[in-house]
């Protein structure tokens, strides 16, 4: 069986005020062209279909148009799971009806979820759609307390493996942060409000291949556990990343081979650095269509710098001054980045600074429970 692995479309994303829906549509057309050219038997999308829980109408329309082509025109089965950006209940709308046409959407976590079985010339292949699952959700559904994403994932996997023949070929879809994988700063939304959000790669040992989503960099955790990365570059911290999809071939014995095929965005991201006068004097036609982050090295602000620079670089999305930051408030710069700390860590530090004492163990436990409940309520909006 041959299938295409993609993830993290983030449809409806607004990047520094720029609506990316046109760029997203163009890259989805590339993915459909790749699927047709490589003659895949299925497409798997490992979460974060939308960028937010309530997506804009143009994002819903783009997904609808894309799935209509894949399912009704090209007759390619599609499996999709919810990620941490998606509202699982909204994504799940019509799932039972769509499954008749081989569009398999797994939104909310369910204790009664069944694997998807597709067949090739060698027999059945079972897909386990491990939709994004918070520990509190796993606790409520399993009746056993699950305090980490790793424990929640273990519970999910047990539910699916109990329904799949032991020696059958198996593929997992999971939206998770695997321990040791490379995270992109300022790119992916943290999975946990507090506590451990990482999962161990050994959880996926029973599967012939695991199609991962969540991290935006295309990377291999092992030969059979891989991230394909996001549809587009969604942060200037991703500027050096190469976006791609994986074409996975599964043979009769369950051995895999993977080909990684690149995706090309209509507008690439680039970072331009230098003093104002030099940047104005330079001619860089290769950057004319790029979305830019401009870092000025001038020691004083330039009046109307962005508008003036846009006569040379028409797509400036972010402008900052390197020297002004360097000579700014050093105390604030030395504070740990929120992305390097959990919400619990940040609140504990805030509490310590404002009350001159640390949280007690009981207070820490109450905070953890409150943040878990808040995360659950946010996903239900």
Indicate residue ranges for each PLM-predicted region.
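Catalytic-core regions built around general acid/base machinery
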Residues: 62-74, 196-207
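Divalent metal-coordination and catalytic microenvironments
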Residues: 8, 28, 48, 63, ...
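Alpha-helical scaffolding segments of alpha/beta enzyme cores, especially the outer helices
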Residues: 30, 61-69, 93-96, 155, ...
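N-terminal active-site segment of His-dependent metallophosphoesterases
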Residues: 1-68, 75, 364-369, 373
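His/Asp/Glu-rich metal-coordinating catalytic cores
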Residues: 55, 82-220
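Accessory, non-catalytic peripheral segments of nucleic-acid enzymes
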Residues: 37, 42, 250-381
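A conserved active-site cap/scaffold subdomain adjacent to cofactor or substrate pockets
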Residues: 201-204, 208-263
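Short beta-strand segments at enzyme active-site cores
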Residues: 41-47, 78-82, 169-173
